[in-house]
Swiss-Prot record:
Keyword line: Chloroplast, DNA-directed RNA polymerase, Magnesium, Metal-binding, Nucleotidyltransferase, Plastid, Transcription, Transferase, Zinc
Protein's cellular compartments: Plastid, Chloroplast
Cofactor: how and how many bound: Binds 1 Mg(2+) ion per subunit. Binds 1 Zn(2+) ion per subunit.
Source organism superkingdom: Eukaryota
Primary residence: plastid
Name of the protein in question: DNA-directed RNA polymerase subunit beta'
Catalytic activity, as annotated: RNA(n) + a ribonucleoside 5'-triphosphate = RNA(n+1) + diphosphate
Any one GO BP annotation for this protein: DNA-templated transcription
Amino-acid positions noted as binding Mg(2+) in the UniProt annotation, renumbered to this chain: 491, 493, 495
Cofactor(s) it depends on: Mg(2+); Zn(2+)
A GO MF term: DNA binding
Name of a matching Pfam family: RNA_pol_Rpb1_1
Gene3D superfamilies listed in its UniProt record: 1.10.40.90, 2.40.40.20, RNA polymerase II, clamp domain (4.10.860.120), RNA polymerase Rpb1, domain 3 (1.10.274.100)
Length: 687
């Protein structure tokens, strides 16, 4: 469809019978209305022309050849209103044959049929709205049970009898044996409804606003009646399931009201017929014909529907049970057309091959949407395997030179001509083919101000496509920061991603303002952080920050393992900023000295050390008792706790505090500190 702003869009949902009829009906100059498919035939076996009122009828779906009717007459297609648009003999419209790609037909069903998607798919929308079990509804739809139709202000046999515990009853128990055939027909037409007609009556009687109010009241009552202190766990679970059902029911009713969809539209009286070009019959070598499975399923529906029409119109003495069985066959044929195999064993052809139904055609990776509509190749796009780029910023991606020079070739040519490195397009292209050094310089300048879009199929939510600032990398793989993988549902085991270049200024502005990866840190569904460390990152952080499990007690009880340094000499090593011995953990005045010692290979990254910290009283716990106290000759003493050390003067004043850590912790802390400072700096610039 096309909205009022001329934007092409696709909307999927329930439609009214009037809308289905409007899609298909055409009025001929003689006043005849065409659009209904009544015959299960396709092409005549002698003339190879479409059968009239069949599945490929030219009157309904348009001419096979542009401007040529079924009689063979030709007329130039013009826009003049005076020219006749229909052939007077065959009724075929003189129009472009491409109309057979979108002109629809319809089948007028002799009985009402439920749409199997709304009945059998989970959750069942019909069962949720009617607040009935799916098993009961299936028995009603497939004519195994009957439904007592309420007759307003009239005494009925079923009401007078008063022996029914449930609204839906079995035929054997609801019909007395003394009814004759004629009496039974009167009784059935007046007081009993079965099949999809019973479902439609109940859906039509629903008031969605009253349904929402009653469901909300029941939900509140269940919340007040909950058992305190989990006295009855089984009842609590039962109440919880009922409350969840009521919430789903309210949301479903809201959706119907918001979209102006009537619940009874989930029961079909008109079945749309797809355009012929979407279910073709083609001729292969040897004169044989290949047909789409949809055609065979449509034929099955028409055959059974015509049989039911004959039973209802020509044979008035037909037993009601036979009519009900035929209605059940029509329901099953429509179910097979819409979703083959949803009720059990799928329908197969003569070669034991399962027929592809409408659901099979549109769903999945090879379906109409993902393969035909979403899987098209477009210009200014590329594709490659993704690999990890841990040194990249969150909003950057590494683009291989081979891909970048092709994607940005137009911008590159313009840059070479503007800076007078090439006088025309031909010379610029030759420089690009030869990959001169100036080409890479211009390419980097072009890429600095141009974001790219990365997409990983399937795009199930909006984080499946995000914007990045590209940089040139060696190799043939796209480099990606590991933290953005969760939004794409990607990993580095061979996944591929597509890269697209937004061309217009509007697209580039939208990419920068809305789609950059560092602005999409929360899940749009539940609001939880989505850029969180996983897998290899968690293992790396664990190894980086893991120290001795026994902590400060390791040296006390394992004196042989207290040599934490690679310097095996026993002599005391002194420096201006730190001191350490073989049997003592080193002391450092700042983190730079600790990292310098690690770079000089004098300590390991997991070696415990004491790092001087600012005088922060929050580190000291008032209830914690020191493990050891070391006194020195000048009167100062060290209070050693599990995670920190306090140096006090003779007056018990705190002179300095050391925390027990290792180089891994220090490196991790510095990375976080630099990231926070960079964020604060960027935020202050924005203000």
């Amino acid at each position: 469809m096309i909205d009022q702003y001329k934007h092409q869009q696709l909307r999927i949902g329930s439609v009214s019978p009037q809308q289905i009829s409007a899609w298909a009906k055409k009025i001929l100059p003689n006043g005849e209305i065409v659009g209904e498919v009544t015959k299960p035939y396709t092409f005549h076996y002698k003339t190879n022309k479409p059968e009239k009122d069949g599945l490929f009828c030219e009157r309904i779906f348009g001419p096979i050849k542009s401007g040529i009717c079924a009689c063979g007459n030709y007329r130039v297609i013009r826009d003049k209103k005076d020219d006749p648009k229909f052939c007077e003999q065959c009724g075929v419209e003189f129009i472009d044959s491409r109309i057979r790609r979108y002109q629809m037909g319809y089948i007028k069903l002799a009985c009402l049929v439920t749409h199997v998607w709304y009945l059998k798919r989970l959750p069942s929308y019909i069962a949720n709205l009617l607040d009935k079990s799916l098993k009961e509804l299936e028995s009603l739809v497939y004519c195994d049970f009957s439904f007592a139709r309420p007759v307003v202000k009239k005494p009925t046999f079923l009401r007078l009898r008063g022996s029914f515990e449930y609204e839906i009853q079995s035929w054997k128990h609801s019909i007395p044996l003394f009814f004759t055939t004629q009496g039974f027909d009167i009784f059935r037409n007046r007081e009993i409804s079965s099949g999809a007609g019973a479902i439609r009556e109940q859906l039509a009687d629903l008031d969605l606003r009253i349904l929402m109010d009653s469901s909300l009241i029941e939900w509140k009552e269940l919340g007040e009646e909950g058992s305190p202190d989990n006295e009855n766990e089984w009842e609590d679970r039962k109440v919880g399931r009922r409350k969840n059902f009521l919430v789903r029911r309210i949301e479903l009713a809201k959706h119907f009201l918001r979209t102006n969809i009537e619940p009874e539209w989930m029961v079909l009286c008109l079945l749309p017929v797809l355009p012929p070009e979407l279910r073709p019959i083609i001729q292969i070598d040897g004169g044989k014909l290949m047909s789409s499975d949809i055609n065979e399923l449509y034929r099955r529906v028409i055959y059974r529907n015509n049989t039911l029409i004959d039973l209802l119109t020509t044979s008035r003495s037909t037993p009601g049970e036979l009519v009900m069985c035929q209605e059940k066959l029509v329901q099953e044929a429509v179910d097979t057309l819409l979703d083959n195999g949803i009720r059990g064993q799928p329908m197969r052809d003569g070669h034991n091959k399962v027929y592809k139904s409408f659901s099979d055609i549109i769903e999945g990776k090879e379906g109409r949407f993902r393969e035909t509509l979403l899987g098209k190749r477009v210009d200014y796009s590329g594709r490659s395997v993704i690999v990890v780029g841990p040194s990249l910023s969150l909003h950057r991606c590494g683009l291989p030179r081979e891909i970048a020079i092709e994607l940005f070739q137009t911008f590159l040519i313009r840059g070479l001509i503007r800076k007078h490195f090439a006088s025309n397009i031909g010379i610029a292209k030759s420089k690009i083919r030869e990959k001169e050094p100036i080409v890479w310089e211009i390419l980097q300048e072009v890429m600095q101000g141009h974001p790219v879009l990365l997409n990983r199929a399937p795009t199930l939510h909006r984080l499946g496509i995000q914007a990045f600032q590209p940089i040139l990398v060696e190799g043939r793989a796209i480099c990606l920061h590991p933290l953005v993988c969760k939004g794409f549902n990607a990993d580095f085991d061979g996944d591929q991603m597509a890269v697209h270049v937004p061309l217009s200024l509007e697209a580039q502005a939208e990419a920068r303002l809305l789609m950059f990866s560092h602005t999409n840190l929360l899940s749009p569904a539940i609001g939880d952080p989505i850029s969180v460390p996983t897998q290899d990152m968690l293992i790396g952080l664990y190894i980086l920050t893991s120290g001795n499990r026994r902590g400060i007690y390791s040296n006390r009880y394992n004196p042989r393992n207290c040599g934490n340094f690679r310097n095996l000499k026993n002599e005391r090593i002194r420096d201006n900023n730190y001191k350490y011995t073989k049997k003592k953990e080193p002391f450092f005045c700042n983190s730079y000295d600790a990292i310098g010692a690690y770079q000089q290979k004098r300590i390991n990254f997991d070696s415990p050390l004491w790092l001087r910290w600012r005088l922060d009283q929050r580190i000291i716990s008032s209830r914690e008792v020191p493990i050891e106290v070391h006194y020195e000759s000048l009167g100062t003493y060290h209070e050693i706790y599990e995670h920190y050390l306090v140096v006090r003067s003779t007056k018990k004043e705190i002179r300095s505090i050391y925390i027990r850590t290792n180089v891994g912790h220090i490196s991790f802390y510095r990375e976080i500190e630099e990231a926070i400072q960079g964020f604060c700096r960027a935020y202050s610039y924005d203000i």
